[in-house]
Amino acid sequence: MKAMKILVASMLAACSTWAAAQQPIVIKFSHVVANDTPKGLAAEYFKKKAEDYTKGRVKVEVYANSTLYKDKEEMEALQLGAVQMLAPSLAKFGPLGVKEFEMFDLPYIFDNYDQLHKITQGPIGQSILAKLEPKGIRGLGYWDNGFKSFSANTPIKQPSDLKGKKMRIQSSKVLEAQMRALGSLPQVLPFSEVYQALQTGVVDGTENPISNLYTQKMFEVQKHLAMTEHGYLGYAVIVNKKFWDGLPPDVREQLDKAMNESTAFANRIAKHQNDQDLEKVKKSGKTAVYNLTPAEREAFKKALLPVHKEMASRIGPDLLQQVNAELAAPSKKK
């Protein structure tokens, strides 16, 4: 009888182990923007690729629009293991103590996507991601959103037009310095609160890629948009390091493959999405869109480029020297 009980117990244990082994590995992927933004679309693309390549061994649950965690909460949630994957904007990593990421916030550091990708897809970008590991975070890649432009309820044609205005920014010393250089009053607000703050006059204006301005309906409460394209907004896709290191090697390999393809997808659609959303903003009739003349663009550059020197000691002069040297070097033929 005793032998029978042991046999039954062992069979039940075996069944339990088998059932546990069949449970998929769940990745909770939280972000703060809409599903139809470049990041939102790329997150869904990653979900499909990850689940396909792992043949269902991994299940990705995407939580968009701050439905799981808000701006200020998500990084801590990742470090504690409450969520496994995020794609925060690059400005979020300076307050975390990795100030090298603030290089991406510098105004007019990149003239175009080709220059940007020389950094994000090269050794400099990878070395910056590696600095997250002591924080318990592994960086998997960079996703584009786009180049930011200023919006407000009064016309913006020259730097002085922003003087005295309360401008919403992300928490970033570089962005604070940028706004002060224009005579603006920087106001740090979570992304999910920006629409209401613009609507109620808590802030006068903001800076965003067009996809954010459109999908979050900020254009409904901003009468003017100037295509300054003065700064870049992108994301680092990150994962809890302990979780990542605990995955079977073949699963990591499949997820890396899914991430590489998702990164190519994200960066391919980002500009297209922003161009499409710009046309939608124009057609809405709610926001007047102004294209700067070359002289006006130079005036903004002249006002903002001193921020590079001001922030050099914070970001790291050696890093800035490496970035500038890489940007000045001829591009390698593919």
Describe each model-derived feature in a short phrase.
Residues 1-8:
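Bacterial N-terminal signal peptides that target proteins for export
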Residues 22-115, 123-126, 130-334:
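N-terminal secretory/targeting leader peptides
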